[in-house]
């Protein structure tokens, strides 16, 4: 890698066309400018100037190095301008959350994206462990977690909580079913569904619930946005956080049946500790808070 100081001295020399003027601009001595030139030539193994009395011309190598020096200065100028301008509507935003919360959040992000062509938002649905790891290694700027991460390198804010819901077709009886009734319908399973069942169904049907591995499975859906679809068509039942129901386009064809023992999942917004948030991340944070507020 070229020595940045020597390159800057050489670029100034080329701009002024004179050793004395270059030394004055850089607040150096003329021998100091000559020394930087010699060191840069030694580093490259090429002569950069051809002397003609008190003046000089650039060699082919010198022309190339001068072009590099000017390009470096332009890059630095653009960098300084970017650092001084904290534009809410430009740059990259990387968010990770559960699939159900992503369904709720994405429609809230779309108007902002439409109004800000310079903005790139990456919203990733991920398991809790991946969200935590991604926040720590810098892959994600913001993450929505199901618990306070309690990590020294992260700071977290409690957003609220959302209920884990039993979801039936809209024409299901408006009463709490027994587990035998649910099993007769069959479970619409999904990646998180088995853990939800062991949590909510075991809590409410302790004598009848046989465990997730023994439930009658009617369907398995791996796309978070389509999990309620079979239930909306009268097929089976499922378990989802409230956000997964609110974001479903045909939620009028679903019935959420409150169970005697209710289960709530916490929502925490986490980011790297000590990192000042630029304007775009502050706005993304505010939109996440707004989305979480829909679940109250």
Predicted regions and their residues:
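A late-sequence structural motif
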Residues: 104, 173, 235, 255-296
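Flexible hinge/capping segments at coil-to-helix
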Residues: 156-193
């Amino acid at each position: 890698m070229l020595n940045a100081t020597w390159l800057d001295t050489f670029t100034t020399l080329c701009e002024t066309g004179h050793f004395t003027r270059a030394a004055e601009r850089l607040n150096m001595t003329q021998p100091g400018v000559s020394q930087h030139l010699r060191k840069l030539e030694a580093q490259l193994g090429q002569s950069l100037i051809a002397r003609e009395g008190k003046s000089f011309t650039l060699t082919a190598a010198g022309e190339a190095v001068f072009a590099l020096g000017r390009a470096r200065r332009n890059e630095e100028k653009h960098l300084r301008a970017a650092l001084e301008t904290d534009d809410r509507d430009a740059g990259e935003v990387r968010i990770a959350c559960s699939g159900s919360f992503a369904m709720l959040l994405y429609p809230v992000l779309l108007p902002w994206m439409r109004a800000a062509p310079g903005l790139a938002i990456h919203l990733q649905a991920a398991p809790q462990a991946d969200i935590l790891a991604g926040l720590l290694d810098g892959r994600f700027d913001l993450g929505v977690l199901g618990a306070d991460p309690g990590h020294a390198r992260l700071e977290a804010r409690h957003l609220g909580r959302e209920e884990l819901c039993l979801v039936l077709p809209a024409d299901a009886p408006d009463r709490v079913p027994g587990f035998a009734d649910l099993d007769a319908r069959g479970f619409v399973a999904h990646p998180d569904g088995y853990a939800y069942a062991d949590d909510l169904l075991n809590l409410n049907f302790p004598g009848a619930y046989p465990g997730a591995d023994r439930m009658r499975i009617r369907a398995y859906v791996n796309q978070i946005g389509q999990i309620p679809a079979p239930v909306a068509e009268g097929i089976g039942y499922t378990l989802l956080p409230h956000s997964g129901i609110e974001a479903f386009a045909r939620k009028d064809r679903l019935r959420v049946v409150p169970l005697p023992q209710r289960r709530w999942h916490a929502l925490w917004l986490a980011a790297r500790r000590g990192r000042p948030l630029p304007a775009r991340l502050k706005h993304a944070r505010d939109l996440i808070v707004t989305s979480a507020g829909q679940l109250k």
